[in-house]
Amino acid sequence: MKAIYRDMCPNCRGAITDERLAAKNPCDACLDEPISMDDYFQLVTAIRKALKLKGVLKEWEEIYALNKEVKEIEELFKKATGFTFWSAQRSWVKRIIKGKSFSIIAPTGMGKSTFGAFMSIYFALKGKKSYIVVPTTPLVVQTVKKIKAMMEKAEVKVNLVYYHGNLKKKEKDEALEKIKSGNFDILVTSSQFLATRFDELLKDKRIDFMFVDDVDAFLKASKNIDRSLMMLGFNEEIIKKAWEIIKLKKQLAKLLQNESGNEEVEKLNREIERLEREIERYKKENKIGILIVASATGSARGDRIKLYRELLGFEVGSGRSVLRNIVDTYIIPEKSMEEHVEELLKTLGRGGLIFVPIDKGIEYAEQLTNYLKSKGFKVELVSARDKKGLELFEKEEVDYLVGVATYYGTIVRGLDLPHLVRFAIFTGVPKFRFSLDLEQPTIYRVLGLMSEILEFLPEEKRTEGEKLYARLRRLIRNIPQYELMKIEEALAEGLELEGFYNHVLEVFKQAVEFLREALKDEEVLKKIAENPFLSLKQIEGKWYIEIPDVRTYIQASGRTSRLFAGGITKGLSVILVDDQKVFNGLIRQMRWRFVEFEIKPLGEINIEEVLKEIDRDREKVRLVLEGKISEQVKDLVKSALMIVESPNKARTIANFFGQPSKRRIGDLVAYEVSIGDKMLTILASGGHMFDLVTTEGYHGVLLLEKGGKRYFVPVYDTIKRCRDCGHQFVDWEEKGVCPRCGSRNVYDALENVKAMRDLAQEVDEILIGTDPDTEGEKIAWDIRNVLSPYAPVIKRIEFHEVTRPAILRAINEARDINEDRVNAQLVRRIEDRWIGFELSQKLWEVFENYNLSAGRVQTPVLGWIVQRYKEFTESETDFLGLTLENDITIILEGVSGDVQEVYVKEVTIEEREINPLPPYTTDAMLQDASRFLGFSATHTMQLAQDLFELGLTTYHRTDSIHVSNTGIEIAKEYITQEIGEEYFAPRKWGEEGAHEAIRPTRPIDTGRLIQLIRDGIITLPRNLTKDHFKLYDLIFRRFMASQMKPAKVLYERAVIGTPYGEVEIEGYIDVIYDGWSRIKPLPLKKLPRLEKDQILKVTEIRKWRAPKVSLYTQGDVIALMKERGIGRPSTYAKIVQTLLQRGYVIETKSKKKLVPTEKGIKVYHYLVSKYKDLVSEERTRQLEKLMDMVEEAKANYQEVLNELYEEILRYVKS
């Protein structure tokens, strides 16, 4: 037993040990002896039986009932379909049992429609009404067939009614009559039927279970959203209130963006809360049905869809996966394109798409098709005008399709055949081609070209272009493609449009004019011609620019790699390179979008092995589609819950895998995505949820006896925070009331625990992805403990950067909790509590002030600041500043006379190599951010936390300077492309350990990062401030410099003689080789060349008095902490922050120097006079080492706690 948690017993809600929780058992008051079994459901059943026998069965019944009902439903499913549930289907059933509505995003073959059809039968057998809405008549027929087949197999009868256009008149009349009178258990119609017949037939019907298959067709009439809500039991008044909330939230978002006053924000928040309470009351008083919206690739747009969020607690995602499992390759052609394609088809076999670049167009596509046909290949050309090839390909009557590589091309987007498409061939790099006068511009191409050439424009023009670009991008964000085409036509034909679209047209026109103007500038064209990523060509006397069309490449190659039930099919892409510069541009842009992207010459890959893997996946897909799923495929797709601390981290991770669907669970938002082999729900816990209590044991720690030895057990309860006064506490004085201000508006982390327990019951496994340090491990341990009884499997995942590859790797390498790290954190927290409480109470007694506090680490640090201040005040002296005729400045100390001239007494000049510094550790980053940017330690740590959570830099709490292979690759790519290959000098910088140095996660500098965010290529869940970019720039430059060759300078050291003594100066005369100084300034002054015995006239004299010793900045104090072994990367900033918060130290406004206050000086002197041995620097350093030893399993944490306890008894209690 390591700890006790109050109120966490899953049966009686009493106190329970960590051991009992981890063993998935109730507390020892409920069960005398723990029960253990391998099978989760058997364990739950056995525990229920034991609790019942003892007469203490309470909340455990809910865990049992849920699992039992799933088993029963699964039995029926097995009877009806012949299969057991997929893991994902089991999750969906659990949600339905709990009465939750949700959106299903699942790949092909996950049995969404089967599930919807089956659940409607289940509800019918319970005497409840179901309604299934599908997009088309054929699907109505198919669904009805499915339901009838299941009824027959399961030997059940329910009243099934359906309507579609192919019914005979008599059948139609009968169906309409039954619908009108509500004489049905299950109703199946198209979404068109719901839209047109709602008022006359469906408005007054109440539905218990509604299943919408294919959200896109359903949303064609956005009022279908209101219709579905009314059928589920909401009235028009409540829907209006939800609509009001949506509008208010939009206003609120605007206010927050403009950083408007608190009053308005408060007012809106109060109004939203009032409406939300009314909706909740309505839902409690009325029976509301369950809605499931299924979608493979839904792209739900518009505000109306948000009604589901406000009334049913979920948002529809898009399900569009951004996962690629593609082997990207290229060939530099040595013969004609046609011959290369012919050769490839012979090697690669059937199932290929062949894309012709847009500059070659449909004529070349026809020519290529005819050539391939003449060589005996079964191939068809597909275009917007002629799509019959698609059908032939689907029926496997042809083996290949040829089309033009454009973003909205028929075979670029309209093809989802994971079992047939094996590879894609590009007969040229997908590209945009523009004539310099921009004939027939389209909006996306104009944006693409602007994005590429803005960096070549003079600053004023660039700023104007950036504003125009941002405006046009913002305006078209929610405009569908067919409307954009109308705007483009209007520009081409010189027409006007109505309202908002005319405004868009005007901005589009300005953008086109801006580009035409820019492309007349000779200087700009020269820069384009020199650029390695764009192509400037003259064709038939006319100049053209070509830029890569990366969106089309992603879409087109993506046809070969689709998400299906069991993973992501492997695909192959081959580019025949027709333009090296555009190809370079394509690679660069792919790397910006996919950190893990790499492309190899086709000859370098093992083609036989790749084709084997491709065919193995196709076989799996066929089995899934034909319903012949072997059990092993079924187990491939698990439902999992990933828990991280912050909403930013959760959103960043979710966005790696497509546009997630969202659900509200209590105060938390859960994001859902499919990552191939997992249906992943991602949730933010909000960080620490538990802390030591204050009302039990010795300051929250029980002292027990075990085998004649003292044993310490901390008692934890959930953290509470008052929303009105901000006070944070653990123990209630009066339940639900803030002990400081009396407010009842108190947040309790218990709410988060309940929400997490609720979600935990839905999944097969839980993955805890808290920060990779002792603090993160302790949070993970708490989460593991309190969720354990609710889920069969819980694992810890650890990642040091938030990137897609790192997350996927972490999931594959999931481990158990590291108990040693937890022990170290337990010791740190208990020590902090004991010392803090004991010494603070002494301070309260002596100074009669309850705001005072003391801690072991902060005391020596306060001492340094007090001592430095003393030296500062005692060291005032005269200074004489001399500016010499060659602009050198020298300063003489303790002198106040006059000087006319000085001479060069000694001079040495030599060539010197200057090595770069290693990449940042936490302390070095805090020092530099303080020195160069004027940031406080807390501000820097918050910015670094954001950059880490948004996936831009690696974990920021580290004392390692080691660089991983991934880091070296990133540096290589950036330095080679942007500075020059000859500058790259890879360095590992030290041994590999648990952590890595702080570095960027991609080869993207600050200017490029700003551009990629502006262009929407990198989308972040929150906006970055100027300070974020400044810190990113500091980290980026320091890291890149650390991977570059040394700089070589002509170094000069000189001794200057004056009437008052000598002054030494050093610096460099010249740079011989710039090396890393290309990216970061040298840490030396530039000096003129000096000669021995040279006489130099003084041109200016300044005199002043000042202290010799300067005060510390936050950066200086942190450097000292590191040097003297006090504090750790996770505590540096907190220690300084505490001294400032307590008012022991203040920071000067302009120079940010630290000055102790009178209170601080008194507290320090009192503590040192009374408890010197307890708070000395030496003892603090020893303790830090002890905690490190606990973490490394070299010391027993109970023994360390005992030592601490004895020490406190000795020094304080006595």
UniProtKB/Swiss-Prot annotation:
<keyword id="KW-0460">Magnesium</keyword>
<feature type="binding site">
    <location>
        <position position="30"/>
    </location>
    <ligand>
        <name>Zn(2+) 1</name>
    </ligand>
</feature>
<dbReference type="InterPro" id="IPR034142">
    <property type="entry name" value="TOPRIM_RevGyr"/>
</dbReference>
<dbReference type="GO" id="GO:0006265">
    <property type="term" value="P:DNA topological change"/>
</dbReference>
<dbReference type="GO" id="GO:0003677">
    <property type="term" value="F:DNA binding"/>
</dbReference>
<feature type="binding site">
    <location>
        <position position="725"/>
    </location>
    <ligand>
        <name>Zn(2+) 2</name>
    </ligand>
</feature>
<dbReference type="InterPro" id="IPR013824">
    <property type="entry name" value="Topo_IA_cen_sub1"/>
</dbReference>
<dbReference type="InterPro" id="IPR003601">
    <property type="entry name" value="Topo_IA_2"/>
</dbReference>
<dbReference type="InterPro" id="IPR005736">
    <property type="entry name" value="Reverse_gyrase"/>
</dbReference>
<feature type="domain" description="Helicase ATP-binding">
    <location>
        <begin position="93"/>
        <end position="252"/>
    </location>
</feature>
<dbReference type="InterPro" id="IPR013497">
    <property type="entry name" value="Topo_IA_cen"/>
</dbReference>
<dbReference type="GO" id="GO:0003918">
    <property type="term" value="F:DNA topoisomerase type II (double strand cut, ATP-hydrolyzing) activity"/>
</dbReference>
<keyword id="KW-0067">ATP-binding</keyword>
<dbReference type="Pfam" id="PF01751">
    <property type="entry name" value="Toprim"/>
</dbReference>
<dbReference type="GO" id="GO:0016887">
    <property type="term" value="F:ATP hydrolysis activity"/>
</dbReference>
<comment type="subunit">
    <text>Monomer.</text>
</comment>
<keyword id="KW-0677">Repeat</keyword>
<dbReference type="GO" id="GO:0005524">
    <property type="term" value="F:ATP binding"/>
</dbReference>
<dbReference type="Pfam" id="PF01131">
    <property type="entry name" value="Topoisom_bac"/>
</dbReference>
<dbReference type="InterPro" id="IPR006171">
    <property type="entry name" value="TOPRIM_dom"/>
</dbReference>
<keyword id="KW-0547">Nucleotide-binding</keyword>
<comment type="similarity">
    <text>In the N-terminal section; belongs to the DEAD box helicase family. DDVD subfamily.</text>
</comment>
<dbReference type="InterPro" id="IPR027417">
    <property type="entry name" value="P-loop_NTPase"/>
</dbReference>
<dbReference type="Pfam" id="PF17915">
    <property type="entry name" value="zf_Rg"/>
</dbReference>
<keyword id="KW-0413">Isomerase</keyword>
<dbReference type="InterPro" id="IPR003602">
    <property type="entry name" value="Topo_IA_DNA-bd_dom"/>
</dbReference>
<dbReference type="GO" id="GO:0160097">
    <property type="term" value="F:reverse gyrase activity"/>
</dbReference>
<protein>
    <recommendedName>
        <fullName>Reverse gyrase</fullName>
        <ecNumber>5.6.2.-</ecNumber>
    </recommendedName>
</protein>
<feature type="binding site">
    <location>
        <position position="89"/>
    </location>
    <ligand>
        <name>ATP</name>
    </ligand>
</feature>
<feature type="region of interest" description="Topoisomerase I">
    <location>
        <begin position="635"/>
        <end position="1214"/>
    </location>
</feature>
<feature type="binding site">
    <location>
        <position position="722"/>
    </location>
    <ligand>
        <name>Zn(2+) 2</name>
    </ligand>
</feature>
<keyword id="KW-0479">Metal-binding</keyword>
<keyword id="KW-0862">Zinc</keyword>
<dbReference type="InterPro" id="IPR014001">
    <property type="entry name" value="Helicase_ATP-bd"/>
</dbReference>
<feature type="binding site">
    <location>
        <position position="645"/>
    </location>
    <ligand>
        <name>Mg(2+)</name>
    </ligand>
</feature>
<feature type="short sequence motif" description="DEAD box">
    <location>
        <begin position="213"/>
        <end position="216"/>
    </location>
</feature>
<dbReference type="GO" id="GO:0008270">
    <property type="term" value="F:zinc ion binding"/>
</dbReference>
<dbReference type="Pfam" id="PF00270">
    <property type="entry name" value="DEAD"/>
</dbReference>
<keyword id="KW-0863">Zinc-finger</keyword>
<feature type="binding site">
    <location>
        <position position="741"/>
    </location>
    <ligand>
        <name>Zn(2+) 2</name>
    </ligand>
</feature>
<feature type="binding site">
    <location>
        <position position="771"/>
    </location>
    <ligand>
        <name>Mg(2+)</name>
    </ligand>
</feature>
<dbReference type="InterPro" id="IPR023405">
    <property type="entry name" value="Topo_IA_core_domain"/>
</dbReference>
